[in-house]
């Protein structure tokens, strides 16, 4: 089994760019950024529970990474950079730390490296469980209205919140809930030590208004790019800034 994806060919021999979206996004999320890099092959993946992969069930990160590997093989992608946002960034970090073959470098935007104590995991498990129950039972417009009131999204304007709520409400609440629980921060290991031992380039992107993840970026051995005029979802709030950072990172 493989994940649904959209593939855009590039020049032969260059590493591919593999893009992983955030929770409730899909393969379209990164395209305004990725399509600025025509020289590279680009693969935009729908994670399980999302988009064209909505019907694919997973029990945890191991299943997600197994599906990611199978998808890369199916597209004959042998050398690649992983670029992931939020949930996609956590999947990318997990894959990198487990030694996914062919990985040339890692770019994470607003991805959490992991909780560091059991009490935090218990609290996160309860919180994600409450959200999952809401995704299963309530109209998605109501759930996402509240979702985007969370402190991490404080930099969004009312208009941006309204647009995101309308966009994300096109999802399937049941499959979102399942993926939220399967890949909760409560079940993700603390990756800091493994990330600090990576043998390939690791870059971290965060919006200048995203104080939480700017602080987390200092806890991993990554070169940090701060995206101006952006909060947690920097590639949506300032795509040109993220394109500039990726061009520097990839030397394109």
Curated annotation (Swiss-Prot):
Pathway: Quinol/quinone metabolism; 1,4-dihydroxy-2-naphthoate biosynthesis; 1,4-dihydroxy-2-naphthoate from chorismate: step 3/7; Quinol/quinone metabolism; menaquinone biosynthesis
Pfam families found in the cross-reference section: Abhydrolase_6
Entry's EC annotation: 4.2.99.20
Gene3D superfamilies: alpha/beta hydrolase (3.40.50.1820)
Described function: Catalyzes a proton abstraction reaction that results in 2,5-elimination of pyruvate from 2-succinyl-5-enolpyruvyl-6-hydroxy-3-cyclohexene-1-carboxylate (SEPHCHC) and the formation of 2-succinyl-6-hydroxy-2,4-cyclohexadiene-1-carboxylate (SHCHC).
Alphabetized NCBIfam families for the sequence: menH_SHCHC (TIGR03695), PRK11126.1 (NF008340)
Cross-referenced HAMAP family: MenH (MF_01660)
Family statement drawn from the similarity comment of this UniProt entry: Belongs to the AB hydrolase superfamily. MenH family.
The name this protein goes by in its record: 2-succinyl-6-hydroxy-2,4-cyclohexadiene-1-carboxylate synthase
